[in-house]
UniProtKB/Swiss-Prot annotation:
Keywords: Hydrolase, Magnesium, Manganese, Metal-binding, NAD, Zinc. It is an enzyme of class 3 (hydrolase). Transmembrane segments: none annotated. This is NAD-capped RNA hydrolase NudC. The keyword Magnesium applies. A divalent metal cation 1 binds at A174, E194, E235. One of its GO terms (biological process) is NADH metabolic process. A motif (Nudix box) lies at residues 175-196. It comes from Pseudomonas savastanoi pv. phaseolicola (strain 1448A / Race 6) (Pseudomonas syringae pv. phaseolicola (strain 1448A / Race 6)). Homodimer. GO terms for molecular function: magnesium ion binding; manganese ion binding; NAD+ diphosphatase activity; NADH pyrophosphatase activity; RNA NAD-cap (NMN-forming) hydrolase activity; zinc ion binding. Substrate binds at R84, E127, Y140, Q208, C209, W210, P211, F212, P213, H214, S215, A257. Divalent metal cations. Mg(2+) or Mn(2+). Binds 1 zinc ion per subunit. Its cofactor is Mg(2+); Mn(2+); Zn(2+).
Length: 278
């Protein structure tokens, strides 16, 4: 028997009564000792500086709404926590919900005005879209497809680090898909651009929503074909082959990057394959 999803997205009517709500400001999401969801009626009594409200779905059957604040404010007994911290710890279903909420918030903030004429937009009832009446344009949440690939050579894996990474951490190669390009073409191009290596036997492994701010990560495994590593200037601080028994600090456990690495380690050792987060 299939288990129902704890979190499901939906476009809910903000005029409806009741339900729960999550609250986002420039400091992250509101949190207390019970979590990041609050009774909607209780929040209404706090006189929060709400910029917009959105019905985003159901968590364990309860309707959930998003309140986007104009600025962060102090709420007694509560604190603000960034989205990445929710990813690293706690209930992963809650992170999935907040990740969706963050993307809705980004979309609503970036599409308050039409990009064609500059006029104010309105949210379409029953649809996740903003509308410009003047240009008859519907503006939907942005999703940016990107690839991430683990390149392997026997008992070695190719890992790299960006100057933006946490000190010492290495990860799989990644990059955004260009217009007119397939995900597979993107993998070959990005690997060549970033490390000057050719790959073969490309295999799709799975995908993960990456709401920082709106990526869809498409995960791949590839085998090394030819070429010596030459890191791309300014983009890649270091790249090298690591033996699977001597790896550097790796990405967070709940990331698709970590899954690709753990899946290959399991394959080499004969251990059970890990589960892709999300």
């Amino acid at each position: 028997m299939a288990h129902p999803e704890r979190w499901t997205t939906a476009v809910l009517d903000v005029e409806a009564d009741g339900g729960l709500a999550v609250v986002q400001s420039d400091q992250g999401f509101l949190l207390d000792t019970n979590g990041a969801m609050f009774p909607r009626g209780w929040l209404a009594g706090l006189d929060l500086p709400v910029q917009s409200e959105h019905g985003i779905g159901y968590f364990e059957g309860e309707p959930v709404y998003l309140l986007v604040l104009e600025r962060s404010v102090a709420v007694e007994g509560c604190s603000w926590q960034g989205l990445r911290q929710f990813m690293l710890e706690g209930d992963f279903a809650v992170f999935q919900m907040l990740g969706y909420a963050a993307q809705v918030s980004t979309w609503a903030r970036e599409h308050r005005f039409c990009g064609a004429c500059g006029r104010a937009t309105v949210q379409i009832r029953g649809e996740r879209a903003m509308f410009c009446e003047h240009d008859n344009l519907r503006l939907y949440p942005r999703i940016s497809p990107s690839m991430i690939v683990l390149v392997t050579r026997g008992d070695e894996i190719l890992l790299a680090r960006s100057p933006r990474f946490v000190t010492g951490m290495y990860s799989a190669l990644a990059g955004f898909v260009e217009p007119g390009e397939s995900a597979e073409d993107c993998v070959h191009r990005e690997v060549m651009e970033e490390v000057q290596v050719r790959i073969k036997n490309l295999k799709y492994m799975g995908s993960q929503c990456w709401p920082f701010p709106h990526s869809m990560m498409l995960g791949f495994h590839a085998e090394y074909d030819s070429g010596d590593i030459v890191p791309q200037a300014e983009e890649i601080e270091d790249a090298r082959w690591f033996h699977i028994d001597d790896l550097p600090p790796l990405p967070a456990n709940r990331s698709i990057a970590r899954y690709l690495i753990e899946a290959y380690l399991a394959e080499r050792s004969g251990a059970p394959e890990p589960v892709l987060p999300g």
